[in-house]
Amino acid sequence: MSAQGDCEFLVKRARELVPQDPYAAKAWLITARTLYPTDFNIQYEMYSIERNAERTSSAGRLLYDIFVNFPDQPVVWREISAITAALRNDSQDKHAQFLKGVFETLPGQVQCKMLLKATEQCFNTLEKAEMLLLLLKRFPESVVQHGVSLGESLLEAESVEDLETPVNCFRKLFVCDVLPLILNNPEMCLPVSLLYKYLHKAAEFYICYVTREPSADGQMQGSQEVGGLNSPGRGRGQRSVIDGLSDKASVVTEPWDRLLEMVGVVGSLCDWQGEKGSRSYAELLQRVSDLCRFLSAADADGFSRCCSQIVSCCTLVLFHCAFHYVSAVQPSLFQGHSSLSSGPWVLLEDLSSVYADVEVERKHTHKKRKLADGREKTMSSDDEDVLAKGRGRHIVVSKSEMLNWAETLDHFRTARESWDLLHSHPSLEAEFAKICSAWKTEMWLWFRIFLTDMIIYQGQYRKALSSLALMSSLQLQQNQNQNQNSLQTGSSSSLENHRAVIQQASCHYALGEYRLACEKLLEAVGGLLPQNQEFVKSSDEQRKPRSKTRRGNDLRLVPCTSKSILPFCLQLMLACFKLRAFTDNRDDLALGHVIVLLQFDWPQGESLFLKAVDKICQQGSFQYENFFNYVTNIDMLEEFAYLRTTEGGRVQLELLPNQGMLIKHHTVTRGITKGVKEDFRLAMERQVSRCGENLLMVLHRFCINEKIILIQSLP
């Protein structure tokens, strides 16, 4: 019998004995190994018996022998692949735990060599990276040799794949696994330029990760495979899962904290001025703000270093605070927020002073004197407060409706300060522009929302309108991308669309473009549903006197709901018509619109209504044929009834449709026909019976039915 035949016989005999007498089987194999020490099959059979019996120590020793003596055998690499696969995942499977134990019994040098060899056997970039990560984590000394090359290979793979987003498997492994090993290794000595490159890559990943759009089902979905890696392309379309990674491997905990910690490490390595380890983003901004004061006095080298430090820190603070602000005012943009539970908020001009007016000399004694003297004027609800003073502007917000109002406005303020700092010097602005270009921030809808609100806050309304146009374009693109998204309901999409339209109306008003403002707000009103009558009552009851009147350049942050937006639209329309109604030129149509709109939030507009009555008395007549369609306020009805009397001045009122034609054909001594007078009395009686109607429904109908005439009434 040949030597090969002898070996096969001995192995076969040992296999037959394993079930009945494993010790006899081992004896046969020990004998065989002594006779044929270079035969692979004999030694592999010995290892297989120990592995199948899950005897960790002996299996480890035998694996060591066959790895050293037969490194090129394919079956050896299949075994090593199974072991490294067990090492790469957190499976609690019994066999996987055994394989990990076998690996742990190997000498460190052999472990290192085995992992390096296993890496060479990998042709998939992800698997190769994961294998090298095992090596780097177990043998930190290898980071110096392999860390940067691994990081660069991941970034190169990302570039070659031409992926749409930084939130991909290659960047995630680089930022969350490889980069911390590189930065925290004291033996590494990287150029400052490379440190900044890596910091910016990490920042882009973390920012894009936290600002991801909602997933299709709002839950983490993905492969249930044991391994941490999938082949790229799997799971595509599952937005919560990073393409190429399992669901568990896709999760990044506390991304903002991780980024802040990384900033501290990079700052220390770059020898930043005043770097003591960042405890918060606000503290980070404070340090670079102090540094900016010395920027002009620095030499060329110092200027360059300071510039890079300031831009990097301010950029991160800007996006951190802008994200938290936008996540409060439009949470449905991001994962982890349900658009069904919280809608958007919108930053608008504060119109609480729309009812204010200068005192005028009264020539008419009013029937309802109590309207002028018996009630104290009110401005806004007592649950509101002011924060964020800057450039002479205030932002008013209801604390009862936005529980985290102080934090939200503080984030808005800090983000604005960061933006201003980044644009305080041409060099800073140029470096920041490079980062924005590389990150394609012009495509970030959430950041455009912040920029728009900031521009509105700055009072640059023409620029704000351009920004709103860009925002609408991005919103349309996002809606098209999410047309299969079950969470993106028509209601939510409509509210977000209203947000932009209402801000456009507010900006046009601030620019004095009242007709354009009216067009936009009427567009928004068409999609709103007025609240029930109870809302009107409770709103009135909650209003209490305020000691001082706010200035006209304040802003108000309000929820983008019918309950809040319809009142704003009515106030804005009133503001648009108010100046036209009370000019020296007679404009009964504008004055009539004002009277209709003054019914809302009554009696806030009492003084303005009384001024309108004074003007009517001075004119001696008033024509508004929509009066009985939309005026249901009892105080107003009594005042107009009084105007017809001798005591009220016998004012000629043309409030019925076609009343003017009747008067021309049937004039009597007092300038009014008896038939018209009777019609007026009956109409007034019918109107009194309507005083209990839902006022918001009446005013909403006014906006819808009279849309064309309202727009045409403005220049």
UniProtKB/Swiss-Prot annotation:
Residues 220-241 are annotated as: Disordered. Keywords: Nucleus. One of its GO terms (biological process) is snRNA processing. One of its GO terms (cellular component) is integrator complex. The keyword Cell inner membrane does not apply. It is found in: Nucleus. It holds the Pfam family INT10. Its main location: nucleus. Component of the integrator complex, a multiprotein complex that terminates RNA polymerase II (Pol II) transcription in the promoter-proximal region of genes. Component of the Integrator complex, composed of core subunits INTS1, INTS2, INTS3, INTS4, INTS5, INTS6, INTS7, INTS8, INTS9/RC74, INTS10, INTS11/CPSF3L, INTS12, INTS13, INTS14 and INTS15. The core complex associates with protein phosphatase 2A subunits PPP2CA and PPP2R1A, to form the Integrator-PP2A (INTAC) complex. INTS10 is part of the tail subcomplex, composed of INTS10, INTS13, INTS14 and INTS15. Belongs to the Integrator subunit 10 family. This is Integrator complex subunit 10. The lineage of its organism: Eukaryota, Metazoa, Chordata, Craniata, Vertebrata.
